[in-house]
A protein has these predicted regions:
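Histidine-centered catalytic micro-motifs
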Residues: 69-80, 229, 236-243, 257
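Sec-dependent N-terminal signal peptides
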Residues: 3-14
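Histidine/acidic-residue-rich catalytic or RNA/ligand-binding cores of hydrolases
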Residues: 82-85, 139, 203-205, 246-254, ...
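His/Asp/Glu-enriched, well-ordered alpha-helical/loop segment
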Residues: 315-397
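N-terminal metal-binding scaffold of metallo-dependent hydrolase/deaminase domains
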Residues: 1, 16-54, 396-401, 416-417
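Divalent-metal coordination cores built from histidine and acidic residues
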Residues: 71, 86-207, 214-234, 281-302, ...
Length: 419
């Protein structure tokens, strides 16, 4: 099935100009933000309209199936290189994911694949380029390993030193920030990302190599980075690991939080799951600042598994507690899995299993909140007049059986019938 989908995708690429026609979509059950309404739409020049155009090229009978906006992926590190690019594109589209946010990427690599992205027959991606961290900070220590795995074939000739200034920027002071900022902007990032990791222990960890990979920037730089980014018209995402990291980031004025405390527990460092519990003051700050967060809680099952069952249960309890607080205070949650090889489908399946949110809330997170967080200036989150004619068609009502979101019968992107 994957192969057939990929062959179809390649066929669509070749036939693209002829495929974007004026289409009349009839007999659909269209998601209106709270329920489904029977109706019809036309796709004209890639946008939805109720007004009948002079010429209709094609009529598509949706046969009373359920229509929802496409999904977003708030945190992923693919696509990034040309290695297996077709596979990644097909995987996202197959899962109904049209919009992707990559919060740490390599511009040397992404520039080479830019012509393959943000097209009608592909996925739309926003890249942060390299993240801002400090000497010995995450993710700088991760790349020597990735050079032997993920990037082994994709970046021939690269060494561990090649990643500095591409995958990350080492900034330890305000002076270094001022010096490197023009270069960061010259790389044309789609947004800015910086790393806070145990900011409450910054001074103790700063020069201790035992904490390499387990530290981030000086928390005192957070507000300065945000101010400079906003002045340049760029939004800011912050990697946060602890409740204090959240507080620092929120007070600094970031627009988005990557990770919610509890996605990882540093058991070997002597920390317990309860260390990552949020309090009401921080969650109220979330609401006040109108900041959204991508929990990436599925990492507990995919990459950051605890050693014992007791640890696993304790971490799940903290995750559930934190999400219940976010829900109580109506903090917007986006969906992303922080992976190179998985998609947001993994995160959604995991969040669903925690039974914190209703089917309606989960659906809106994935097809409204997440796409809006990636491309806030595009009309992609509703099925209304003047919005992009991009949507997914499901055989049954996902508000009744949520697993229907994984059972997609048709994908349409800006009026282009994919498959």
């Amino acid at each position: 099935m994957r192969l057939l989908s990929l062959l179809f995708l390649l066929f669509v690429t070749a036939a693209l100009p002829a495929q974007q026609k004026t289409i009349h979509f009839t007999n659909g059950q269209w998601f209106n933000g709270s329920s489904f309404t029977a109706g019809e739409f036309y796709s004209v020049n890639g946008y939805l309209t109720k007004s009948k155009p002079a010429v209709v090229d094609t009529i598509v009978d949706l046969k009373n199936q359920f229509v929802i906006p496409p999904f977003g992926e708030a945190h992923n590190h693919s696509p990034e290189t040309d290695q297996d690019l077709d596979v990644y594109i097909e995987r996202y589209l197959s899962d109904g994911i049209f919009y992707i946010k990559n919060p740490n990427s390599i511009p040397f690599a992404t520039n080479k694949i830019a012509h393959r992205l943000n097209k009608l027959n592909s996925v739309d991606v926003l890249f942060a380029n390299g993240g801002i961290t400090a000497n010995g900070g995450h993710p700088s220590t991760l790349y020597p390993y990735l050079l032997t795995t993920t990037y082994k074939k994709a970046l021939p000739g690269w060494t561990a030193k090649s990643f500095e200034g591409e995958a990350y920027y080492l900034i330890n002071s305000k002076e270094e920030l001022e010096k490197k900022w023009p270069y960061i902007l010259a790389q044309k990032p789609g947004f800015i990302k910086f790393y806070l990791i145990f900011s409450e222990e910054y001074k103790e960890r700063k020069d201790d190599t035992a904490f390499n990979g387990k530290k981030g920037i000086d928390p005192g730089l957070a507000g300065i980075i945000v101010k400079k980014a906003h002045a340049a018209g760029l939004k800011v995402s912050a990697h946060a690991e602890t409740p204090n990291d959240l507080k620092v980031a929120l007070l600094a004025g970031v627009d988005e939080i990557n990770h919610l405390p509890g996605y990882q527990v540093r058991w070997r460092g002597g920390y317990t799951a309860d260390y990552y519990k949020l309090d009401k003051n921080i969650v109220r700050l979330f609401k006040k600042k109108r900041v959204h967060v991508d929990p990436t809680y599925s990492l507990l099952k995919t990459e950051l598994k605890p050693v014992t069952n007791e640890q696993y249960k304790a971490q799940v309890n903290v995750q559930t507690y934190n999400l219940q607080l976010l829900r109580k205070y109506k903090v917007p949650v986006t969906i992303g899995c922080d992976s190179y090889n998985l998609t947001a489908k993994t995160e959604m399946e995991y969040l669903q299993s925690l039974n914190v949110y209703s089917n309606l809330e989960l659906l809106k997170m994935w097809c409204e909140v997440t796409p809006a967080a990636i491309f806030p200036n595009r009309k992609i989150t509703k099925l209304q007049e003047g919005y992009e004619a991009s949507f997914l068609v499901l055989p049954n009502n996902p508000l009744e059986k949520f697993d229907q979101v994984y059972n997609i019968n048709l994908r349409v992107k800006q009026g282009l019938l994919l498959w």
